[in-house]
């Protein structure tokens, strides 16, 4: 524990806990681990859970963020089949856990490096498209696995890099970086998932009226003429530079072959905003202790306070336990 606290003091933001499902939960026989080890002062912590029938996702999800490994499996299946319904894309495949507490990936080191080579078949194009879909979502923290140089297409370890070398530069790809920026810009916006025109080869993730990501899973450009919630205007794709027109609730444009377009208004996304997940602003108090997530976007500084207590500064996202009967105030400075 002293090591973790020292790491935080030295600038570490958080911790990954491997194979957490094999460590007992508080309340189980002889357990005093998680309620001690998680109290280290870090900003973000998550536990790796490879889901199965006995992984107790809900139990661990009450303590920390956890990985949604079954959702990643669904994403990889969609990439292989080159189609996904909006319903399947929407379902995080985890029960009893707030989606804000999920860690999302296209693949993990286990999927790639284990003997069954569950994800090794994917190429860079597959990873780009999968990443575009998960980073466009309103909930969850996305995690990118950096493969060895020369990876994929069934080749696990091509020998072009050694232990300690930098991995693949795919994380710098235009779709990957545009997806990351979109994820941050849309942090407080609601989502609407659909297949334009009912075509499951194309997935569209809209974020309120502010932005959208459209993913074309197949070869050949896809012409889009679909309903949308986006505000009227002309949107320029952050990846290809193509333009999309939105007028009277419809969007038109062309999505490149096996690619994704990322659409949003940079200026509109730069306004400072705050929000609270798990708390209704119309309520004057919380009737019982409740975990919520505070979010801030494009703010130089933000604070929260409980009741008449002291204001506490925080960065971007923080989880807080509300004490019964106290009103929560989340504000920009």
Residue ranges of model-derived segments:
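Active-site-proximal helices and loops of the catalytic beta/alpha 8
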Residues: 2-269
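Low-complexity, disordered linker/stalk regions enriched in Pro/Thr/Ser/Gly
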Residues: 268-333
């Amino acid at each position: 524990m002293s090591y973790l606290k020292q790491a935080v003091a030295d600038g570490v933001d958080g911790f990954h806990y491997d194979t957490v499902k094999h460590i007992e939960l508080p309340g189980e026989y002889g357990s005093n681990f998680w309620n001690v080890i998680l109290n280290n002062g870090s900003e973000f912590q998550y536990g790796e859970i490879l889901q199965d029938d006995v992984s107790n996702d809900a139990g661990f999800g009450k303590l920390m963020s956890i990985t949604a490994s079954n959702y990643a499996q669904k994403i990889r299946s969609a990439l292989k089949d080159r189609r996904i319904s909006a319903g399947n894309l929407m379902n995080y495949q985890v029960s009893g856990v707030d989606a804000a507490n999920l860690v999302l990936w296209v693949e993990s080191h286990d999927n790639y490096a284990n003997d069954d080579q569950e994800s090794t078949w994917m190429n860079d194009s597959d990873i780009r498209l999968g990443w575009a879909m998960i980073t466009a979502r309103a909930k969850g923290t996305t995690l990118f696995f950096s493969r060895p140089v020369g990876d994929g297409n069934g080749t696990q370890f091509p020998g072009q890099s050694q232990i300690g070398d930098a991995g693949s530069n795919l994380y710098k790809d235009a779709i990957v970086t545009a997806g990351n920026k979109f994820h941050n810009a849309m942090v407080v916006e609601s989502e609407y998932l659909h297949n334009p025109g009912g075509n499951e080869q194309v997935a569209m993730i809209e974020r309120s009226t502010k932005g959208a990501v459209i993913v074309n899973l197949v070869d050949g450009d896809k012409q889009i003429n679909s309903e949308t919630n986006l505000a009227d205007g002309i949107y320029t794709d952050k990846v290809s530079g193509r333009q999309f027109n939105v007028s009277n609730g419809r969007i038109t444009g062309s999505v490149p072959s096996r690619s994704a377009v990322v659409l949003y208004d940079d200026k509109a996304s730069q306004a400072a905003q705050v929000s609270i997940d798990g708390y209704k602003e119309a309520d004057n108090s919380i009737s019982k202790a409740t975990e919520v997530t505070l979010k801030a976007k494009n703010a130089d500084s933000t604070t929260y306070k409980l009741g008449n207590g002291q204001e506490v500064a925080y960065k971007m996202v923080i989880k807080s336990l509300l004490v019964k009967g106290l009103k929560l105030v989340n504000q920009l400075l």
